[in-house]
Design a protein with these regions (language model features):
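Amphipathic C-terminal alpha-helical segment
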Residues: 38-44, 87-104, 119-127
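Short amphipathic alpha-helical/adjacent loop interface patches that line ligand
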Residues: 1, 25, 36, 61, ...
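Hydrophobic alpha-helical connector segments
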Residues: 6-37, 75, 82-85
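Solvent-exposed, amphipathic alpha-helical segments
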Residues: 3-11, 88-95
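Amphipathic alpha-helical packing segments from all-alpha helical-bundle domains
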Residues: 5, 47-73, 79-83, 109-120
């Protein structure tokens, strides 16, 4: 999970707002594609892990929170936006991971489209 977080932070450097959020989302999926079986392990660790795994997961949430807050959206809705974003990223990864192994470019593109659509709604509602 640490490596995944580092990769997500790296792709966000120098990017802003929607672009950074989309790149981080795709990098999350990329990591799962490149490391079969890790997604399931991460989910188990988040649910049953230690204080250390909780800290690592919270670093992931902190990155997304920072990116959300950089978007000049309603600050009072940050947690609500974070929940929508993580729900989309995790849900999409869960449902599409099997397809991603055989058609990774298609799945990456479709995740980017899903995130774009979500962000359009978020920016319309919470700006």
């Amino acid at each position: 999970m640490r490596e995944m977080n580092e990769r997500m932070m790296k792709v966000a450097v120098g990017k802003i707002e929607k672009e950074a959020i989309k790149l981080v989302s795709i990098e999350y999926l990329n990591y799962m594609i490149e490391h079969p079986g890790v997604y399931e392990t991460i989910q188990w660790a988040v649910w049953h892990g230690t204080e250390e795994t909780a800290t690592i997961f919270n670093n992931y949430l902190s990155l997304l929170t920072t990116l959300i807050q950089s978007c000049s959206l309603n600050k009072d809705k940050t947690l609500e936006i974070l929940n929508m974003l993580t729900g989309t990223i995790h849900g999409y990864t869960t449902l599409q991971l099997g397809n991603a192994f055989s058609a990774p470019d298609k799945v990456r593109f479709e995740l980017a489209e899903a995130i774009d659509t979500l962000l359009v709604g978020i920016f319309q509602k919470y700006k």
